[in-house]
């Protein structure tokens, strides 16, 4: 019984530390998203993981914005997941907190996420927008909005829960998995 109490106490302390850390983070201060919403929404959690990996840049003067909506014409908008502004330029992050296998070609509008369904069952396949094209649109809209030239860098961040199986690139684009210190 004492061991169970001790385990529950340790779990409670860890949860409180994570909660307080989140509530004091720039991510929370900017988005106002509740802690449980961040932990239960896969997309929001991916954005928060990007911020956690980059938050040390705040000490060097970097500023962060999240879920930035920009006009793209005809009354429509496009959303940047994470924007980091620093002395080197502006970094535009597209977060893909996916699992499974990822297949894509830089030239194709849609990419595929393949999720295994168990032995003997076909994989479930989901289509999603090409993140390279998405970020090109974000950067074009950001340039039009700013009306000045700034160095802008595109970063596509996939979670460590997925495997980039076949990604075909034609331009000088590099990719890597974003490694968070904590997994789901």
Set out the residue ranges of the language-model regions.
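Short acidic loop-to-beta-strand element that houses the catalytic metal-binding Asp/Glu
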Residues: 78-85, 90
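A short, highly charged nucleic-acid-interacting micro-segment common to nuclease
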Residues: 32-49, 127
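Short, internal active-site loops enriched in acidic
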Residues: 70-71, 158-164
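Conserved small/polar residues in nucleotide/adenosyl-binding loops
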Residues: 176-183
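N-terminal signal-anchor transmembrane alpha helix of single-pass membrane proteins
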Residues: 1-30
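Catalytic cores of nucleic-acid endonucleases
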Residues: 96-157
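A short acidic/basic microdomain associated with nuclease active sites
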Residues: 55-75
């Amino acid at each position: 019984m004492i061991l169970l109490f001790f385990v529950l106490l340790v779990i409670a302390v860890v949860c409180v530390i994570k909660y307080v850390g989140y509530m004091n983070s720039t991510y929370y201060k900017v988005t106002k998203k509740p802690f449980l919403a961040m932990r239960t929404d896969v997309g929001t959690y991916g954005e928060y993981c990007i911020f956690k990996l980059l938050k040390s840049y705040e000490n060097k003067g970097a500023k962060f914005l999240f879920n930035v909506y920009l006009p793209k014409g005809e009354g429509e908008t496009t959303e940047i997941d994470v924007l980091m502004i620093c002395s080197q330029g502006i970094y535009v992050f597209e977060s893909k907190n996916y699992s499974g296998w990822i297949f894509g070609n830089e030239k194709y509008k849609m990419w595929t996420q393949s999720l295994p369904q168990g032995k003997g069952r076909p994989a479930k396949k989901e289509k999603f927008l090409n993140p390279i094209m998405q970020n090109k649109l974000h950067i074009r809209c950001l340039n039009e909005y700013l009306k000045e030239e700034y160095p802008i860098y595109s970063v596509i961040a996939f979670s460590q829960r997925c495997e980039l199986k076949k990604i075909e690139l034609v331009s000088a684009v590099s990719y890597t998995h974003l490694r968070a210190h904590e997994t789901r």
